[in-house]
C-alpha cells in the first residue's frame, strides 16, 4: 500500500527517538543568514523535536514552536520547558496576526501546501517580517556518502527544485553553507531510520535498508572500525521579506 504525502509527513511520531538521536542541528552561519537582525520573536514552524528551536533559544530569542505531531512536541517540551510549543500546521498556524518577526521552517517546507501556508505565514508575520526555509542535504561528493545515497535515496536539492515564494513575499534570496556533522555509527543508523521513506516502508524493506547501512559501516574503508563519522552537509537556505 502506498502512503499518501500527508501520512508520510505525519509518520515521524513513530520514530521520534531515532529522529532526535540521528538528525543533525543547523550551522550558525545558516541561522545568521536566515534571521533578520532586529528579530526578537520567532516562530519555528514544523519544529519537530526542536533541532532548530534549541539554536534559536540559545540566541536569547523569544521562540514559539509549532508542529503537527504530538510525540515530537513532547521531546521538545522536555528539552525546552520554558519554550511555548503548540500543536498546529503551516496551513493553520495557532498564533495571532502580526505577532512574530520571523518564521523559520527547517526541513519541513516540502511537506506543506504552499497555497494555504503562504497566506498563513503572511498573517502571523509583522510588516517587513522574514520567512526563512532551510534544509540540511548530505554532500554526496564524498565517496561513502554517495554510496549511502545509493542505499537510502539521493538527497534532494530544494534550490535545484526551484522553491518559490510568491506575493506578498519579495526579495527572495538563496544561500548555501557547507559544514560537517560528527556522529557515531549508531546515530547514522538512527538518521536513516528516521526518514519518512524508511518509517513508512513495510517491515522487511525497512530491515533490509538498515542492514545495508550496517554493511556499509562495516566494510567501507573510510568507515570500518571507526567510532566516529564525519558526515558533510550542504545546508540550503531560502529567505524572503513580507512586503
UniProtKB/Swiss-Prot annotation:
Gene Ontology terms describing biological process: methylation
S-S bridge residues: none
GO MF annotation, one: methyltransferase activity
One Pfam family named in its UniProt record: Methyltransf_11
Keywords, ordered alphabetically: Methyltransferase, Transferase
SUPFAM superfamilies in alphabetical order: S-adenosyl-L-methionine-dependent methyltransferases
Domain of life: Bacteria
InterPro entries, A to Z: Diverse_substrate_MTase (IPR051052), Methyltransf_11 (IPR013216), SAM-dependent_MTases_sf (IPR029063)
EC number: 2.1.1.-
The family this protein is said to belong to: Belongs to the methyltransferase superfamily.
This protein's name: Uncharacterized methyltransferase Rv3342
Naturally occurring in which organism (per UniProt): Mycobacterium tuberculosis (strain ATCC 25618 / H37Rv)
Amino acid at each position: 500500500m502506498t502512503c499518501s504525502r500527508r501520512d508520510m509527513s505525519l509518520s515521524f511520531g513513530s520514530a521520534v527517538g531515532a529522529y532526535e538521536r540521528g538528525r543533525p542541528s543547523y550551522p550558525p552561519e545558516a541561522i545568521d543568514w536566515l534571521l533578520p537582525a532586529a528579530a526578537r520573536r520567532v516562530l519555528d514552524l514544523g519544529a519537530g523535536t526542536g533541532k532548530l528551536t534549541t539554536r534559536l533559544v540559545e540566541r536569547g530569542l523569544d521562540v514559539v514552536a509549532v508542529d503537527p505531531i504530538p510525540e515530537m512536541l513532547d521531546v521538545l517540551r522536555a528539552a525546552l520547558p520554558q519554550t511555548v510549543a503548540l500543536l498546529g500546521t503551516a496551513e493553520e498556524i495557532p498564533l495571532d496576526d502580526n505577532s512574530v518577526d520571523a518564521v523559520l521552517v527547517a526541513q519541513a517546507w516540502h511537506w506543506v501546501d504552499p497555497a494555504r501556508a503562504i497566506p498563513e505565514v503572511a498573517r502571523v508575520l509583522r510588516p517587513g517580517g522574514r520567512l526563512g526555509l532551510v534544509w540540511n542535504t548530505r554532500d554526496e561528493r564524498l565517496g561513502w556518502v554517495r554510496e549511502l545515497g545509493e542505499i537510502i535515496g539521493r538527497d534532494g536539492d530544494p534550490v535545484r527544485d526551484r522553491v518559490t515564494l510568491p506575493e506578498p513575499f519579495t526579495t527572495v534570496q538563496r544561500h548555501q553553507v557547507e559544514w560537517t556533522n560528527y556522529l557515531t555509527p549508531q546515530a547514522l543508523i538512527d538518521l536513516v531510520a528516521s526518514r519518512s521513506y524508511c518509517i513508512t516502508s513495510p517491515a522487511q524493506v525497512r530491515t533490509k535498508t538498515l542492514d545495508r547501512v550496517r554493511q556499509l559501516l562495516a566494510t567501507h574503508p573510510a568507515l570500518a572500525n571507526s567510532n566516529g563519522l564525519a558526515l558533510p552537509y550542504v545546508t540550503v537556505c531560502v529567505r524572503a521579506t513580507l512586503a
